[in-house]
């Protein structure tokens, strides 16, 4: 049993070594000419290093999208709506050199141009004060100094208090309720 387990371990190790070996680098190793950063594409050609901080990765992503080794549905990304009609069109079939630096083929968009019409109404509100408070679960949310205009509220910000909840009808929280509901019975005083 030990001999079969050892043979299996040796076979798995040999398989891993064979699968991870790169035949191009074994033949090209010659003293000082070998560079650990050199890479080869699917056709066996050396790829140039575009820059030292990942330029090679950009090239590899470009080659993966247009290589014949990747199936069409994997290299093709999501469709986008055409600006010329309601029909959804696939990605443009222009060569990678003509479709932008990253080869996306997508029209570049600014964050402000994103269509937010399908989002909730809460997202469209820019300020918390614009939210409609009429549907709040408690009916006692009131503002003090509601007779002041919004200009006065901004001008006298220190005099304008935060929103408050009216708790005067509860036994705790107002002077009026302390007279009505004392904590100690009157006959003990």
From Swiss-Prot:
It comes from the Eukaryota. It is found in: Secreted. Orcokinin-like peptide: Expressed in corpora cardiaca (CC), corpora allata (CA), antennal lobe (AL) and gnathal ganglion (GNG) (at protein level). Expression in CC, CA and GNG detected in some animals, in AL in few animals (at protein level). Orcokinin-like peptide precursor-related peptide: Expressed in corpora cardiaca (CC), corpora allata (CA), antennal lobe (AL) and gnathal ganglion (GNG) (at protein level). Expression in GNG detected in most animals, expression in CC, CA and AL detected in some animals (at protein level). One of its GO terms (biological process) is neuropeptide signaling pathway. Residues 1-21 form the signal peptide. Its main location: secreted. Residues 22-124, 145-174 form a propeptide. GO terms for cellular component: extracellular region. Belongs to the orcokinin family. Myotropic peptides. This is Orcokinin peptides. The lineage of its organism: Eukaryota, Metazoa, Ecdysozoa, Arthropoda, Hexapoda.
